[in-house]
Amino acid sequence: MTLLSCITALTLSAVMIYSPLKLLSDVLLKQAEIEEDILLNQNMNRAMELLMRAIREAGYRSNQNSKNENDIQIKQGGLFRGSDAIELMQDLPKHLAYDCMGNILSKERTRHRKTYQHFYLERSRNDPRSAILICQSLDRQGRLHQAELLNQVQYLQIHWVNPHAVDINSMKPKVASGLIKISLGVERKSQAGKGNTLIEQVRLVAPRHI
């Protein structure tokens, strides 16, 4: 067998072996990305549910003399990539209820007889191109403490919307009544070097007591 024949045979063998290996590698990478997408969506769902629960209960009054005009405060922009923040307060409920960290709301966890929860973004220390969704609440001494709810966040947008609008994209900010629109974006980093993927969720929630 000539040298040229040997080189040709080796080349053909390499091509035949490389193609299945490349295909298998691509399949495994795609499977890993799908699994990460599922996990990110689950984590986003959990964070959204905690935020929506706090919004639904905000403004609760234990008696008619209690005021709740300022129990929902949305802060527009000024945070990571212009993201919004929301502060939520309510009188201590008579039924069993929890804050965003899973603590039972109690008299000790109030300030001026109101519970407090705050959702906002904080730039990640490990990856300055992304942020962490933070939840603040009150501990048993009525002091602020916080927990991280979600990583790899790109934006959080919150505003009052027109409850009569049909198309979500056409909804306009309004005064404190009706519905609140929450938009959350999380980035999944590509393992194949083909660019990152933005995963987005939008929810509408109606406060029950405002």
Locate the predicted segments by residue:
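Short, flexible loop/turn elements at secondary-structure junctions
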Residues: 7-9, 92, 157-162
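Extracytoplasmic beta-strand-rich oligomerization domains located immediately C-terminal to a leader/signal peptide
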Residues: 20-141
